[in-house]
């Protein structure tokens, strides 16, 4: 099972990354709402630990990555609990499998990561997304390129198909670890609604391969993946599932989303607010360095001295952006061929149509609330003067 997931991870397309980040395997029950906690993670790499253990503490850098966690309701209305499993690194499930597995040793518990931005390891809270889902989708397998397999037809699966219709973006008022496996997030009341999500989601089909020969399963997987879908089969059941973007533009939207997320991360780690709280790491003492030189496999506890660390964008995330840029370039090339000499749509206008929750500057939400409070205070003062 682990080997199969590792094989699938190697060939993920940009929209698949985004679906891993934001989309559940099936529509959420009850209220059909999902909360996603977004943060920057800065754990030390094994290469980093080895470097400082040898006493090399000059010009230290650590990659910063965006990560996402599922959340569940807390005791208070404004509280959310983020679970230990990280959707991108697979933290807590398969430590060796995930988008960042080659760069980070993500086997540490959340209790070993903190929210004090001047320390490494640590998390930098970004925002919480509240997404609303609808199931009003009808789809024909032929329209997605799925053909019958040995006389067996693909069937539309309403329970696994949905679209995201709207959502809210919340500031994080406070984030703190409550136990080794979870973290409590207190949300700012100042939320911002956005409605740029219409039509973005997944459509799922299933095919009953009960008692079918192995070749039929192989054909189904090949058929699904050849049209850009994600193939899934539960060995305890007969059906196989094929999940695809809701429409042909979903891959474009996902690529655009990745580029915008990348820009947001670059902006964040280059901001004055981020850099003025310089990240530091506990340096090893002389005895720890001496022990390390005797046996490089020995774990070294940190010493009392703190050394500065510069944040940089992780190389795996950069690779992901390169793939997104390639997808966007292909789309632009096709558009140029179609439009010919016609006037092209301005980039800013076209981006407004794309799935883009981060187009809203969540850091500005507090300012908007302050302006609203100032207006209310001014109205209150005017009322007092009149009386």
UniProtKB/Swiss-Prot annotation:
Principal place of residence: virion
Entry keywords, A to Z: Coiled coil, Virion
Ranges for region Disordered: 365-387
Coiled coil (residue ranges): 315-387
CC annotations in GO: virion component
Compartment(s) where it occurs, according to its Swiss-Prot or TrEMBL record: Virion
Descriptive protein name: Structural protein ORF387
Lineage per the UniProt record: Viruses, Viruses incertae sedis, Bicaudaviridae, Bicaudavirus
